[in-house]
Amino acid sequence: MVSIEDVYHTAELAKIEITEEQAEKFRKEFETILDYFNILDEVEEDVEPTFHVLPLTNVFREDEPGECLKQEEALSNAKHKEEGYFKGPRVVE
C-alpha cells in the first residue's frame, strides 16, 4: 500500500510541490500501477520462449543469371543523373 508520505517523498525527490488533493490522486494512481506489477508477478515463467507469434517461412530462390538493363536504359527515365550514375539528394553536409 502506498502512503501519502511516500507520495510527498516522491514529489520531493522530483522537486515538485503538490497539494493534498494531488497527493491523494497520485497515491491512488501509484497503487493502480503497483497492482499491474502484481498481475505481472502471476505470469507463468516456465514456458518455452517464442520469437514470433506467427510461424515465419523464408522464401529463397536460386540466383540465376539473367538479362539486365543497359546503363543507358536504366538511366533513361532518371530525372537526375551524373557521369553515368543516378544522382540523389545530398544527405550529409
UniProtKB/Swiss-Prot annotation:
Gene3D superfamilies from the UniProt entry: Glu-tRNAGln amidotransferase C subunit, N-terminal domain (1.10.20.60)
Catalysed reaction, written as an equation: L-glutamyl-tRNA(Gln) + L-glutamine + ATP + H2O = L-glutaminyl-tRNA(Gln) + L-glutamate + ADP + phosphate + H(+); L-aspartyl-tRNA(Asn) + L-glutamine + ATP + H2O = L-asparaginyl-tRNA(Asn) + L-glutamate + ADP + phosphate + 2 H(+)
Top-rank taxon: Archaea
GO biological process: glutaminyl-tRNAGln biosynthesis via transamidation; regulation of translational fidelity; translation
Record EC number: 6.3.5.-
Pfam families per the UniProt record, alphabetical: GatC
One GO MF term attached to the UniProt entry: asparaginyl-tRNA synthase (glutamine-hydrolyzing) activity
Keyword terms: ATP-binding, Ligase, Nucleotide-binding, Protein biosynthesis
Claim: ATP-binding is one of the keywords in the record: yes
Recorded family membership: Belongs to the GatC family.
HAMAP family: GatC (MF_00122)
UniProt subunit comment: Heterotrimer of A, B and C subunits.
Function: Allows the formation of correctly charged Asn-tRNA(Asn) or Gln-tRNA(Gln) through the transamidation of misacylated Asp-tRNA(Asn) or Glu-tRNA(Gln) in organisms which lack either or both of asparaginyl-tRNA or glutaminyl-tRNA synthetases. The reaction takes place in the presence of glutamine and ATP through an activated phospho-Asp-tRNA(Asn) or phospho-Glu-tRNA(Gln).
Protein name from the UniProt record: Glutamyl-tRNA(Gln) amidotransferase subunit C
Species assigned in the record: Archaeoglobus fulgidus (strain ATCC 49558 / DSM 4304 / JCM 9628 / NBRC 100126 / VC-16)
Source lineage: Archaea, Methanobacteriati, Methanobacteriota, Archaeoglobi, Archaeoglobales
